[in-house]
Amino acid sequence: MSSPVVLITGATRGIGAAAAVELARRGAEVAVVGRDAARVRETAEAARAAGDGAAPVHEHVADLTLLGDVRRLAAEVLDRHPRLDVLANNAGAMFTARHVTAEGHEETLALNHLAPFLLTALLRERLAADGGGRVVTTASTAHTGASLDLDDLEFAGRPFKAMTVYGTSKLMNILFTRELARRTAGSGITATCFHPGVVRTGFGKNDGLLYRAALTAAGPFLRSPARGARSLVWLALDPAAAGLDGTYVVDERVREPSAAARDDVLAEGLWERSEALTAA
């Protein structure tokens, strides 16, 4: 049996790096995606060591805050990987201030939602080719209490509060997963998302002194990246996860997300807005 091919974004630190290493250790063919070439190489080398040559480990460099880079990455993946079994949409960040990318999108929206939405759209046929592809997206319990304004996804007309914006992006991840499952029903693709727990990682480096202080105080209660990556690895490889289409998972168990995250009308509206924003 050939090794499953798994593409992981945000794979140069934290959950993504830990998942890449564990997937390689389990015999998967891993494709590491990150913005920094040196860090991509570092993760890839760690994965190669863990896999002990059982399967190749590939390196891809892309800035996923830019949709142009997402398109370039997708073209590169399609060119280099004749088969793709799992797309792990793991890249994400929280920002304390509102930044607009060179393409005109608020940075949190661009990285946390539009990038995985577009990358999935561009790789969807390859994932479905063998009738068993999986899309695993890193969400968060931060979605709880978040609401979504389809007329202001960019937070252009509202106060920019880091946790609110981040939580909204995680709500989008769950709605995206739900709608993707609906739209790909019968294709063989399984779409899931998960909460990794509060993980000790470099995630908060863009998040301001107050947020970093809170993480420092919570230090003894934080999970290791390896523990945080466990659900990602399980959803990517375990046969039992193939039947969990459209679900939200916490600690390898299906959980019910917020009411907003279960709103199918909202999910469809977000999908349509996302198609317009990405020209997908």
Outline where the language-model segments fall.
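Catalytic loop of short-chain dehydrogenase/reductase
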Residues: 92-99, 106, 128-187, 195-210, ...
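The beta1-alpha1 cofactor-binding region of Rossmann-like NAD(H)/NADP(H)-dependent oxidoreductases
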Residues: 37, 60-75
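N-terminal Rossmann-like NAD(P) cofactor-binding module of classical short-chain dehydrogenase/reductase
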Residues: 7-8, 85-88, 92, 109, ...
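A glycine-rich helix->loop->beta "capping" turn
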Residues: 2, 50-56, 76-89, 95-100
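Canonical Rossmann dinucleotide-binding motif of NAD(H)/NADP(H)-dependent dehydrogenases/reductases
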Residues: 1-35
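C-terminal helical subdomain
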Residues: 169, 193, 216-255, 262-268, ...
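A short, exposed helix-loop element centered on a Lys and neighboring polar residues
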Residues: 120-121, 178
